[in-house]
């Protein structure tokens, strides 16, 4: 028989006050039909692929570290559109609107041929190959070998108006009662800004190798003293404003090429007879006899060295245009603060140049016998970039709800727009001394006007100034022509301002044969 019972679960009531809703930029930004093209110069960098090279005193950096496994973070500075001398002033009303840039197209061009680079360590911590083992070998006091390998293959770029957020695993602070020398420390996930020069994951994970691998021999030279970061796509995709990542493209591949085992004392022993008076005896292994090589069990610290495998031009993310129609977040390509961040990783052009120099006096033609000690070997890595943009001019209405959201997102934007700024009445005349630094005149002012602080001053980026590299002539540039042709657009001039409109293609009339 059915019996009615009162509800035993919790009842959820709506909040008494409305919850703040973040609007998409498409809801309040008005896009115009005015487009600009911007492109950088050929951006080149040269350095050592594994480490920085210093002088003997250590106070001068002679050769910087430039590796194909590093992140390249370009900070593109754009001009303020509100200070443009537009030929057609009817585009916007400065009393009721402000202008901003929107990214509509992007092409990241890369020079240099495809190539595979190798990395390694002259003291790499490996005992032997454990995939095809034909003899049982236990560890000694030093089993390190000179080993090299190719890294995981990765192509990736991330576009936004704020820096890309990365994640890595870091050594955490243990509880007071758990602090014991020689024990494995706790680890925690950290979020940091990906800066120019930060190492990407090459197959050993995203972690701080400087603090978590104190033997300095578990990974290759280029990351043994570094932090390998990986973009935190989950955090950026769930960001309420979506400024760090408008869109991204990613291609990674690897396979395990070699299988090794670590040398050293095992930190976590395999459970055996030492657990609870033999409770775990013979649960994981049966010990070998005293007359066998297996009497002392070997390490179980297995690890692979990965390989990026084939590098091909058929799977390239670069040297091709990308068009932004709809971003993944609420920010649909609006470049707040007139800047754009492009984070790039590409190790498919990872060739390291080997340069040899004759160290003896005399000429090469006088050498009779080759001696390796007469030559000095150097390694160099080069990178070549060029970035092109299609920018759209947009208008923001100065309404209360729009300004409230922008103020909550970034209040410094309203300061740059100088909203409600009324200059104070100027005095009729000012005092100006000619020899202000002489002893006969008063002391000059000690507090010059403060410049606006850069919120990213403590980070390292590849700064590129595009304030004087914008053009309305889209058909004069490769990316501009692609943008016009791919959507069937045509460029017209109205009141001295070039704008884009959708053109119509009419068929050709053919004369009818009688």
Swiss-Prot record:
<dbReference type="InterPro" id="IPR036973">
    <property type="entry name" value="Capsid_L1_sf_Papillomavir"/>
</dbReference>
<keyword id="KW-1162">Viral penetration into host cytoplasm</keyword>
<comment type="similarity">
    <text>Belongs to the papillomaviridae L1 protein family.</text>
</comment>
<keyword id="KW-1145">T=7 icosahedral capsid protein</keyword>
<keyword id="KW-1048">Host nucleus</keyword>
<comment type="subunit">
    <text>Self-assembles into homopentamers. The capsid has an icosahedral symmetry and consists of 72 capsomers, with each capsomer being a pentamer of L1. Interacts with the minor capsid protein L2; this interaction is necessary for viral genome encapsidation. Interacts with protein E2; this interaction enhances E2-dependent replication and transcription activation.</text>
</comment>
<dbReference type="GO" id="GO:0039620">
    <property type="term" value="C:T=7 icosahedral viral capsid"/>
</dbReference>
<dbReference type="InterPro" id="IPR011222">
    <property type="entry name" value="dsDNA_vir_gr_I_capsid"/>
</dbReference>
<keyword id="KW-0426">Late protein</keyword>
<keyword id="KW-1161">Viral attachment to host cell</keyword>
<feature type="region of interest" description="Disordered">
    <location>
        <begin position="127"/>
        <end position="147"/>
    </location>
</feature>
<protein>
    <recommendedName>
        <fullName>Major capsid protein L1</fullName>
    </recommendedName>
</protein>
<dbReference type="GO" id="GO:0042025">
    <property type="term" value="C:host cell nucleus"/>
</dbReference>
<keyword id="KW-0167">Capsid protein</keyword>
<keyword id="KW-0945">Host-virus interaction</keyword>
<dbReference type="GO" id="GO:0075509">
    <property type="term" value="P:endocytosis involved in viral entry into host cell"/>
</dbReference>
<keyword id="KW-1164">Virus endocytosis by host</keyword>
<keyword id="KW-1015">Disulfide bond</keyword>
<dbReference type="Pfam" id="PF00500">
    <property type="entry name" value="Late_protein_L1"/>
</dbReference>
<dbReference type="GO" id="GO:0019062">
    <property type="term" value="P:virion attachment to host cell"/>
</dbReference>
<dbReference type="InterPro" id="IPR002210">
    <property type="entry name" value="Capsid_L1_Papillomavir"/>
</dbReference>
<keyword id="KW-1160">Virus entry into host cell</keyword>
<comment type="function">
    <text>Forms an icosahedral capsid with a T=7 symmetry and a 50 nm diameter. The capsid is composed of 72 pentamers linked to each other by disulfide bonds and associated with L2 proteins. Binds to heparan sulfate proteoglycans on cell surface of basal layer keratinocytes to provide initial virion attachment. This binding mediates a conformational change in the virus capsid that facilitates efficient infection. The virion enters the host cell via endocytosis. During virus trafficking, L1 protein dissociates from the viral DNA and the genomic DNA is released to the host nucleus.</text>
</comment>
<keyword id="KW-0946">Virion</keyword>
<dbReference type="GO" id="GO:0005198">
    <property type="term" value="F:structural molecule activity"/>
</dbReference>
């Amino acid at each position: 028989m059915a019996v009615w019972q009162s509800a035993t679960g919790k009842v959820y009531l709506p909040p008494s006050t409305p919850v703040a809703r973040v609007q998409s930029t498409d809801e309040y930004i008005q896009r115009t039909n005015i487009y600009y093209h911007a492109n950088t110069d050929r951006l080149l960098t040269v350095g050592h692929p594994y480490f920085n090279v210093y002088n003997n005193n250590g106070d001068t950096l002679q050769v910087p570290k430039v590796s194909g496994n590093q992140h390249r973070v370009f900070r593109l500075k754009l001009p303020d559109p509100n200070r443009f001398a537009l030929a057609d002033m009817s585009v916007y009303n400065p009393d009721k609107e402000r202008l901003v840039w929107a990214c509509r197209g992007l092409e990241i061009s890369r020079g240099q041929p495809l190539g595979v680079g190798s990395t390694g360590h002259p003291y790499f911590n490996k005992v032997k190959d454990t995939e095809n083992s034909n003899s049982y070998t236990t560890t000694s006091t030093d089993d390190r070998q000179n080993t090299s390998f190719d890294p995981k293959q990765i192509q990736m770029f991330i576009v936004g108006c704020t820096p890309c957020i990365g994640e890595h695993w870091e050594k955490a602070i243990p509880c007071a009662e758990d602090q014991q020398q020689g024990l494995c420390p706790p680890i925690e996930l950290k979020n940091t800004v990906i800066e120019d020069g930060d190492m990407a994951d090459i197959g050993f994970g995203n972690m701080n190798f400087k603090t978590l691998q104190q033997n300095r021999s578990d990974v290759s030279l280029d990351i043994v003293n570094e932090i390998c970061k990986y973009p935190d796509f989950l955090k950026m995709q769930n960001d309420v404003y979506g400024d760090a990542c408008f869109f991204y493209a990613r291609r990674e591949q690897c396979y395990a090429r070699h299988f090794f085992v670590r040398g050293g004392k095992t930190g976590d022993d395999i459970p055996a007879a030492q657990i609870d008076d033999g409770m775990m005896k013979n649960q994981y292994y049966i010990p070998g006899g005293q007359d066998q090589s297996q009497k002392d069990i070997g390490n179980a610290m297995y690890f692979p060295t990965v390989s990026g495998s084939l590098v091909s031009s058929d799977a390239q993310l670069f040297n091709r245009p990308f068009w932004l129609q709809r971003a993944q977040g609420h920010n649909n390509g609006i470049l707040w603060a007139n800047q754009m961040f492009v984070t790039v990783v590409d190790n498919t052009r990872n060739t390291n140049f080997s340069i040899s120099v004759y160290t003896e006096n005399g000429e090469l033609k006088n050498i009779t016998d080759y001696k390796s000690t007469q030559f000095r070997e150097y390694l160099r890595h080069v990178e070549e970039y060029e970035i092109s943009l299609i920018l759209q001019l947009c208008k923001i209405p100065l309404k209360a709800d729009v300004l409230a959201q922008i103020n909550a997102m970034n209040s410094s934007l309203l300061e740059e727009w100088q909203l409600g700024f009324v200059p104070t009445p100027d005095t009729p005349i000012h005092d100006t001394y000619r020899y202000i630094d002489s002893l006969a005149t008063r002391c000059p002012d000690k507090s010059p006007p403060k410049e606006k602080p850069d919120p990213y001053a403590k980070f390292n980026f590849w700064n590129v100034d595009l304030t004087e590299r914008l053009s309305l002539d889209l058909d004069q540039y490769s990316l501009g022509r692609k943008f016009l042709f791919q959507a069937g657009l045509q460029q017209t001039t109205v009141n001295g301002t070039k704008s884009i409109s959708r053109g119509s293609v009419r068929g050709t009339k053919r004369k009818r044969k009688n």
